[in-house]
Design a protein with these regions (language model features):
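Predominantly a Rossmann-like dinucleotide-binding segment in NAD(P)-dependent oxidoreductases
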Residues: 45-109
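Beta-strand-loop-alpha-helix segment that lines the small-molecule cofactor/substrate pocket
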Residues: 1-46
Length: 109
């Protein structure tokens, strides 16, 4: 659906998971650049007020340089086909694992 929208001149705000793998991500990002369109992932935790506070505290240096980070997130996943059926390109990592990974990436770059 990302490619369909981009090929029709539409900017894309995509729900996670953005793509299933890196090669797919590179492909749609290249298409967005070629078309000069915005393509981004709608990962809600990235835009929470606490994330802005965390970024501010870290950039101020008030707590020094972080050397270790623990991040986790969990909720009940039973009965959710996108998680339980691998052929749907889901699974726990793409569905919930991305949130703590995104947090770590935001903190450590």
């Amino acid at each position: 659906h990302i490619k369909l929208c981009l090929n029709h001149g539409k900017h894309v705000l995509c729900e996670k998971s953005f793509t299933v793998n890196e090669s797919q991500a590179r492909e749609v990002l290249a298409l967005a650049r070629e078309k000069k369109l915005l393509l981004t992932e709608a990962i809600w935790t990235r835009y929470m007020p606490m994330r802005k506070t965390l970024d501010s505290v870290l950039s101020s240096g008030v707590i020094g340089r972080p050397y270790m980070l623990t991040a986790n997130l969990g909720y009940i996943i039973s009965g959710k086909e996108r998680i339980m059926r691998p052929e749907l390109a889901g699974g726990a990592l793409l569905d919930v694992g991305i949130y703590p990974l995104n947090c770590v990436h935001g903190v450590r770059g």
